[in-house]
A protein has these predicted regions:
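Basic/polar N-terminal segments that are highly enriched at the extreme N-terminus
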Residues: 1-13, 142
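Short glycine-/acidic-enriched loop or helix-start segments at secondary-structure transitions
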Residues: 50, 98-99, 138-141
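Generic hydrophobic alpha-helical segments
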Residues: 17-18
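Short beta-strand edge/turn micro-motifs at domain boundaries
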Residues: 85-87, 109-140
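Short, surface-exposed loop/helix-turn segments at secondary-structure junctions
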Residues: 98-107
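A solvent-exposed, acidic/Ser-Thr-rich amphipathic alpha-helical stretch
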Residues: 8-12, 27-86, 91, 95
Length: 142
């Protein structure tokens, strides 16, 4: 059954609130967007509890202490709505300054394209975040 305009706008607002706090690098506020039983999948790696979800966000660089990327921001290029999810085509942008998923730091500014699938509960909290990101640009050397 297709979603109505009100539900589409509710989900869009929740998604943009999540991206806003990610781009502000505020881990506490990022975690406040997740339900306590949420699951995050990143390139098929599962993070099934709040502690591991928090650690994964910090590892990437979405915290005030930094991580594999500096000056990181997630950019939404397109949004698509299904009955249950929002599908985002986007880019992670930042300087690759630390090891990430087996790729040593390149010290280059990169844009990594991704597709992400978000599911929100009735309470407005994320219950599922699944991200598939193309890391090929990290293997390229200048």
């Amino acid at each position: 059954m297709p979603i109505d305009d009100a539900e589409r706008e509710r989900r869009r607002a929740l998604l943009h609130a999540h991206y806003d706090v990610e781009n502000a690098h505020d881990l506490d506020r990022i975690m406040a967007t997740f339900s306590t039983d949420a699951e995050m999948l990143y390139n098929r790696q599962s993070f099934g509890d709040p502690k591991s979800i928090r650690t994964a966000h910090a590892y990437i660089g979405l915290s005030s202490t930094g991580g594999a990327f500096r000056g990181i921001r997630n950019v939404i290029d397109r949004e698509h709505f299904t009955t249950d999810e929002i599908v985002v085509e986007g880019r992670l942008c930042g300087r690759h300054v630390g090891e990430f998923q087996g790729h040593s730091a390149t010290e280059r500014d990169v844009e990594l394209p991704f597709v992400a699938f978000y599911r929100f509960g009735a309470d407005g909290k994320l219950t599922s975040e699944r991200v598939v990101m193309d890391l090929g640009r990290l293997a390229e050397r200048a």
